[in-house]
Amino acid sequence: MKIISNTAFGGERPLFELHDLRMENVVIRAGESAIKECSNIEAVDCRFEGNYPFWHVHGFVIDRCFFDVGGRSALWYSDHLKMTDTRIDAPKMFREMHDIEIENVEINDANEVFWRCKNLNIKNLKLHGGTYPFMFSSDRSEEHTSELQS
């Protein structure tokens, strides 16, 4: 597995179609589709500021990361995600995905999250505000999920 650490990327698709990659302390700046059409990706202690960073990604781990407001619509059309200890300030996360594990995650703009998702295993998720979470989703297992008004 290739390791990229302590750097930043911006612009359009800087990590397009990469496989078997671990990112440590990486910042994804403004731009679109930074990590598109990838597989076997790990992001640890990373920050996502640009739109659509994880689209069409198959098999990935996101641990101790932060999704800034600009990182909207970050996780779409992907599968086999394990996300832990992460804070999300961006809206419209998790769309048309399956096989998702979430643990110790806080979503501060829960507008339109988890739409058309299948096979979700959720532990300790906090949703703040937003409308229509889990629209058209199925096969959901939850432990300690709270929806808080902002």
Question: What is the predicted function of each stretch?
Answer:
Residues K2-I4, L21-E24, I41-A43, F60-R64, ...:
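All-beta strand scaffolds that present successive hydrophobic residues in beta-strands
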Residues G11-F16, A30-K36, G50-H58, G70-Y77, ...:
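Short glycine/acidic-rich loop motifs that flank beta-strands on beta-rich extracellular proteins
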Residues V26-V27, V44, V57, V61, ...:
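Extended aliphatic helical segments
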